[in-house]
C-alpha cells in the first residue's frame, strides 16, 4: 500500500511538471517600469527569483484562476516552491491545514471533493474556482498557508468607529472611493470596513513574511497594490514582486505594481 501511495504521489508531481511545460503562458505580461512586454521565459525567471511574490486577482474571473494555476506550476518547475499563501483561507485554520498536509505527505490520497472535505473549505470562496490551485499545491507538496482573518475577527472590526492609519497616506482615500462605489449605502460602516481591509492586509503581510520562501500570495487586487495593501505592511526593506492580473486596456501605475498580466475577461 505504501509503495502504491508513493507511486501515486510521484505521478501527481510528474503530471504537475508536464502540465506547466505543456501549457503556454496565458495572456501578456508587461513590465510596468519599462512598459515593455516580457516573454514567457523572462516572466518566469523574474517571478521565480522573487522570495515574496504577490499576485492580485479578480475573484470572479475563471481566467485569473487558470493563470494562478499556471504560474504556481511554472514556478515549482523552475525551483521548489516554498509556500502558497491564500486570502481565501483564515490563518486560524492553519493547524487543520498542517494536519491534512502531513497526512498527504505520508502517501495518502484525497481527490478534489475529499480534499475539500478534509480542509473544511470555506464555502464563501467557491471550490470550483480555487480547488484546482489547492489541489496543485497539495500534489506538489507545497505548504498551503491561510492568510485571512477569521469571521469573528471581521465581525468585531466591522463594529469599529475609529479611523485606521494606513502605511501609505493616500490609501484611505483610494479605498474609501472603491468601497463607496461598490456599496452605495456603506458610508455609516466605512470606518469598520476600512479597519477590516487594514487588518487583512497586515495579517497577510505577517503570514507572507513567516511562510517558507519562496512564497506566493494569492489575494484580491487591492490587497496586493503597494499604494493600498500588503506591501505597506511588510517589514522595511523586504523585497517583494507585485503582479496584477488585468483586462485589456486597464491601467495600473508602476508605483503600485511591478508587472501587469493582461488576460481576457473570461
Kindly give the residue locations of the regions a language model identified:
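Solvent-exposed loop/turn segments at secondary-structure junctions
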Residues: 58-61, 89-93, 150-154, 221-225, ...
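Short hydrophobic beta-strand that contains or immediately precedes a catalytic carboxylate
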Residues: 53-56, 216-219
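A substrate-binding/cap region within the structured catalytic cores of diverse enzymes
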Residues: 78, 82-83, 88, 95-212
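C-terminal regions of proteins
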Residues: 134, 199-209, 216, 223-266
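Sec-dependent N-terminal signal peptides
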Residues: 8-16
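Histidine-anchored nucleotide/phosphate-binding helix
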Residues: 66-76
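N- or domain-start disorder-to-order transition segments that initiate the globular core
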Residues: 13-14, 21-50
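Bacterial N-terminal signal peptides that target proteins for export
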Residues: 1-9
Amino acid at each position: 500500500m505504501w509503495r502504491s501511495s508513493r507511486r501515486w504521489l510521484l505521478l501527481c508531481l510528474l503530471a504537475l511538471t508536464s502540465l506547466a511545460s505543456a501549457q503556454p503562458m496565458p495572456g501578456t505580461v508587461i513590465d510596468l517600469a519599462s512598459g515593455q512586454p516580457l516573454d514567457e521565459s523572462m516572466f518566469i525567471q523574474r517571478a521565480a527569483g522573487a522570495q515574496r511574490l504577490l499576485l492580485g486577482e479578480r475573484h470572479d474571473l475563471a481566467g485569473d484562476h487558470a493563470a494562478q494555476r499556471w504560474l504556481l506550476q511554472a514556478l515549482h518547475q523552475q525551483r521548489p516552491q516554498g509556500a502558497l499563501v491564500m486570502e481565501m483561507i483564515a490563518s486560524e485554520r492553519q493547524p487543520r491545514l498542517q494536519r491534512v498536509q502531513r497526512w498527504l505527505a505520508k502517501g495518502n490520497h484525497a481527490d478534489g471533493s475529499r480534499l475539500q472535505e478534509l480542509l473544511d473549505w470555506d464555502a464563501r470562496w467557491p471550490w470550483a474556482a480555487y480547488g484546482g490551485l489547492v489541489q496543485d499545491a497539495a500534489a506538489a507538496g507545497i505548504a498551503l498557508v491561510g492568510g485571512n482573518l477569521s469571521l469573528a475577527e471581521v465581525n468585531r472590526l466591522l463594529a469599529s468607529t475609529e479611523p485606521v492609519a494606513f502605511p501609505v497616506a493616500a490609501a484611505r482615500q483610494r479605498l474609501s472611493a472603491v468601497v463607496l462605489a461598490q456599496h452605495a449605502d456603506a458610508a455609516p460602516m466605512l470606518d469598520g470596513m476600512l479597519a477590516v481591509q487594514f487588518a487583512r492586509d497586515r495579517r497577510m503581510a505577517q503570514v507572507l513574511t513567516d511562510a517558507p520562501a519562496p512564497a506566493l500570495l494569492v489575494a484580491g487586487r487591492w490587497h496586493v497594490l503597494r499604494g493600498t495593501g500588503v506591501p505597506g505592511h511588510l517589514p522595511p526593506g523586504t523585497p517583494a514582486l507585485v503582479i496584477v492580473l488585468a483586462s485589456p486596456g486597464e491601467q495600473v501605475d508602476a508605483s503600485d505594481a511591478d508587472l501587469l498580466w493582461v488576460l481576457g475577461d473570461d
